[in-house]
Regions:
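A long-range scaffold signal marking pre-active-site subdomains of enzyme folds
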Residues: 1-194
Length: 194
């Protein structure tokens, strides 16, 4: 027998959980492809603070055909029969595989606020402007850059993955996320018509 291991042997199901509070909704999202519950109770509250939940749970259902023309489906139903979603990116070598190190590293949500990105973008632009005094406008900012911006997974947590993950504004066009040059993508300058 070979040394093939299944994803279940390599990775644990995601434990990442975050609460979103947007407009008049408070909702829980999970890292395992499901959302709006905490594995026991409803967590999609509208209006927030009312203890009224319009949905109990939901999940991503994705399907497609592989290179061998075989239908593949990933669909969660209350995590009752296995797990179809694992933390982190998959390899691009044709195997679409992962490993425990990647699963552990990516079992989290990266939350960045628009206000943080606005300040960071303004600081980066100030650094390039000879008429802008960054020490006066952004005193001590470089040593206080938010972790959410420093750790943004544009190319992998440690840059070990060769492809882009989370979207970012690539200001120097090198394809590599560097928080001292780039910032997490928000359409701040209204460049996109969506």
């Amino acid at each position: 027998t070979g040394s093939f291991k299944t994803v279940e042997e390599l990775c644990q199901p995601s434990k990442a959980q975050s609460d979103l509070s947007i407009n008049n909704v408070r909702a829980t999202i999970l890292g395992g492809g499901d959302m709006w519950w905490d594995l026991n109770t409803a967590r999609y509250e509208v209006p927030k603070g009312s203890n009224k939940h319009s949905m109990f749970a939901g999940s991503l259902w994705l399907g497609g055909v592989d290179e061998g023309n075989q239908l593949k489906l990933a669909a969660m139903t209350y995590r009752q029969a296995g797990n179809d979603y694992w933390p982190g990116p998959l390899t691009t070598d044709g195997t679409a595989s992962t490993n425990k190190e990647i699963c552990d590293k990516y079992d989290r949500h990266w939350i960045v606020l628009r206000e943080e990105v606005d300040v960071h973008k303004a600081w980066l632009e100030c650094l390039e402007d000879p008429n802008c005094n960054d020490a006066e406008l952004f005193p001590g900012y470089e040593s206080q850059i938010p972790e959410s911006i420093k750790e943004w997974p544009g190319n992998g947590v440690d840059g070990e993955l060769p492809y882009q993950l989370a979207p970012f504004k690539d200001r120097d066009g090198d394809g590599v996320y560097d928080y001292l040059v780039d910032y997490p993508a928000y359409d701040i300058d209204k460049e996109y018509d969506c």
